[in-house]
Amino acid sequence: MKGAVLALCFFVLFPPSLPAQTQKPLLLGLASISGGIETLYVTKKIGAFKRNGQDVDFLLLQGGSQALQVLLSGEIKLISGGGGTAAQRARFKGAGNVIVATYTPTMPYSLYVNGKIQDAKKLKGAKIAISRFGSSSDFAARFMVSRLGLDPAKDVTIMQIGNQRERMSALLSGSVDGSVVDAPNTLIARQQGFLELADASKLGLTYPHNNIATTDRFIREEPQAVFGFLRAFVEGIAFYRTHKTESIQMIKEFLRVSDNAIAEEAYDYYSRITPAKPYPSTDGVRGVLEEIAVSEPAIKTAKAEQFIDGTFITKLDQSGFIDGLYKKK
């Protein structure tokens, strides 16, 4: 049954590696192919995983819910994801999922508006496109509107439009006045003449958007595998942050785009917000718990520290390994 699920739901982004030793591949599940996640691709491309004793293959899943499901089933040991409400609800109810690193500690969204809206005052009464209610784009839209001094429940109309392409089409057609846009689609929005009114990452929004998550069981049984993976990953992050030209080429491969400007937009944005030391985001998880508590007050008894394990990044940091990566550059 498990093998059938894997065969039907995943495809391998890289051909299975031929182990240099007898080590079996470590499968990392990706909830999506999107901006920020390319740091994992860079890590593999520069050989950092193999240098740290890890034979890593990437598997694409059909969203965050499936990634969490397969992680908890034991079919894969690590995922890029696990930061949203579903994951934290599962953890609170006794599931073994746990965040060991956060490498996008904010929501990578901006609010773009048409040319008639030059400032926050003119945003009042506007229609703003998101994917769906309760989504990260919804959360980001409400946060940005609030930071602009407006009440998202009264001063604007937030509309469920769909994915990024559908939201951009709605903005172009004039059926909405603004939209939540992620990088590198921010470049396309500007090229179409739309104005960036707010950037959530610059307004102080803390959120565990992209994470490395595993299970308590895997940490107990194979702590060296988790440590080796994260040691390689911080090496990949260091390369990404300090080698723009090479990283842009890898972004083009990963996102499957030919436009250098699109890849550069992604690089400029995510290299700015990707931390050198990807500690699990305690503040971000705390925000998710507060979001859940609105409808599930019982979760107020939980502490954010129960949902993360920062021991691996702490060890890498305190040993001087991470700082040493940047001294070499």
Regions found by a protein language model. Give the residues of each.
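Bacterial N-terminal signal peptides
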Residues: 4-16
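Short, glycine-/small- and polar/acidic-enriched structural segments
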Residues: 21-163, 167-173, 177-183, 196-200, ...
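Short linear loop/turn motifs
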Residues: 57, 157-159, 265-271, 303-314
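Ligand-binding clefts/hinges and TM-proximal coupling segments of bilobed small-molecule sensing domains
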Residues: 134-152, 231-263, 305-308, 314-321
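Conserved C-terminal helix/tail region of periplasmic/extracytoplasmic solute-binding proteins
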Residues: 293-329
